[in-house]
């Protein structure tokens, strides 16, 4: 059964890739990712305390195909209405981007230094990061992403786009400064999400078809992935163990603690943004996004995006796939014509690329709103010039 599902995912991905000629097309990403997850499960199946059953595989297949069809239909309908619009390429004046970027970097470094000064460095970088992470879990209002992440992400994307049309010493210096802030942001944020969002955004904006940048991308992914998993985490075990923990275990946990039966420790964060908003208005306390660890042959506290949906009802999962697929298709199509949408979509890709890991489409509504506002504000200062 599992090989049939993998085959369907791969065939669907290749059909969509043939039609759209873009590896970042939503349906292509989702189908390839779930094919890789299931292949990873087959390679490491002896590690788990539970095995994937046919009901779970059928559920995954139906949800992924629902997302795919919603994306294709919505994007195709939109394309019929705007296909006569030229896919104009715009150049953002790099000098203006550098000025805005330096201002953002300056404020970011001041904030980072203030935050880091609140913690006493321990015996290792790992213990230092754990101290910061524990403080953020207890007090989510102190989380770095809540303050600076949307601004830095927007500035980074604008810089990458403007850098496509310039190659100056100023650009190289600015790249170094952005990288330094980025590394400190990882240490302060102690999360993986910002790392992958930046990597995906860079790959989408630059274009993986450019060989030189593709090599840089693969190198960056390899270095960051190895650094995070082997050095910062310091966990025992080989590559199969890490593959299991970060790629496959969420689906196993979803099946055992949500899909087959809802455990006592289960919860849903699909409406977390609205719950937190109501908490701010009424003075209440919102639920933490951190879920409890469970044992599936190894420890994990992520349960795929589907867990947040099926906790309420299985029907909600299909509805969310329709909504998510439609929005993703629209954004992909509009990103071909508008820089602002291209920048937003470069980060929105994360929502469907990591469905197998956790829910970020609904729970990160606040971030999507903040990034949108940042793009709107920056667009008032940065006037793009049509060059083709």
UniProtKB/Swiss-Prot annotation:
Gene from which this protein is expressed: wbbH
The species this protein was found in: Escherichia coli (strain K12)
Membrane-spanning intervals of the chain: 23-43, 57-77, 97-117, 143-163, 180-200, 215-235, 312-332, 338-358, 361-381
Protein function: May function in vitro as a polymerase that catalyzes the polymerization of the O-antigen repeat units on the periplasmic face of the inner membrane, leading to the formation of the lipid-linked O-antigen molecule. However, E.coli K12 strains do not normally produce the O-antigen in vivo due to mutations in the rfb gene cluster. K12 strains are phenotypically rough, their lipopolysaccharide having a complete core structure, but no O-antigen.
Membrane-protein topology: Multi-pass membrane protein
UniProt entry tagged with the keyword Lipoprotein: no
Lineage of origin: Bacteria, Pseudomonadati, Pseudomonadota, Gammaproteobacteria, Enterobacterales
Entry keywords, A to Z: Cell inner membrane, Cell membrane, Membrane, Transmembrane, Transmembrane helix
GO cellular component, one term: plasma membrane
Name of the protein in its database record: Putative O-antigen polymerase
A GO BP annotation: lipopolysaccharide biosynthetic process
UniProt subcellular location: Cell inner membrane
Domain of life of the native organism: Bacteria
């Amino acid at each position: 059964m599992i090989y049939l599902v993998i085959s369907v995912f791969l065939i669907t991905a290749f059909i969509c890739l043939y039609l759209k000629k873009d590896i970042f097309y939503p349906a292509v990403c989702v189908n390839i990712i779930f094919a890789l997850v299931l292949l990873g499960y087959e390679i490491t199946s002896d590690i788990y305390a539970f095995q994937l059953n046919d009901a779970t595989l059928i559920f995954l297949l139906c949800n992924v195909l629902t997302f795919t069809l919603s994306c294709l239909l919505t994007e195709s309908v939109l394309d019929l209405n705007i296909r006569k619009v030229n896919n104009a390429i715009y150049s953002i004046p790099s000098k203006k981007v550098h000025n805005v970027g330096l201002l953002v970097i300056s404020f970011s470094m001041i904030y980072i230094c203030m935050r880091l000064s609140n913690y006493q460095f321990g015996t290792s970088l790992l213990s230092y990061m754990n101290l910061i992470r524990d403080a953020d879990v207890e007090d989510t209002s102190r989380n770095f992403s809540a303050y600076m992440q949307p601004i830095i992400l927007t500035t980074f994307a604008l810089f990458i786009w403007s850098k496509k049309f310039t190659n100056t010493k100023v650009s190289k210096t600015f790249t170094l400064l952005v990288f330094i802030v980025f590394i400190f942001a990882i240490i302060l944020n102690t999360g993986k999400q910002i790392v992958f969002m930046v990597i995906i955004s860079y790959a989408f904006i630059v274009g993986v078809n450019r060989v030189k940048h593709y090599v840089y991308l693969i190198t960056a992914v390899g270095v960051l992935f190895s650094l995070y998993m082997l050095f910062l985490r310091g966990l025992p075990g080989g590559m199969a163990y890490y593959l299991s923990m970060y790629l496959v275990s969420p689906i196993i946990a979803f099946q055992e603690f949500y899909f087959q039966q809802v455990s006592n420790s289960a919860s849903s964060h699909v409406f977390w943004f609205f719950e937190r908003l109501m908490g701010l208005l009424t003075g209440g306390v919102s639920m933490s996004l951190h879920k409890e660890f469970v044992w599936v042959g190894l420890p994990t506290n992520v349960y795929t995006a589907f867990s947040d949906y099926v906790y309420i009802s299985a029907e909600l999962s299909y509805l969310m796939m329709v909504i998510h697929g439609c929005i993703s298709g629209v954004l992909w199509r509009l990103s071909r014509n508008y820089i602002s949408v291209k920048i937003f979509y470069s980060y929105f890709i994360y929502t469907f690329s990591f469905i197998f890991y956790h829910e970020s489409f609904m729970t990160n509504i606040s971030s999507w709103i903040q990034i949108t506002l940042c793009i709107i504000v920056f667009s008032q200062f940065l006037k793009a010039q049509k060059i083709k």
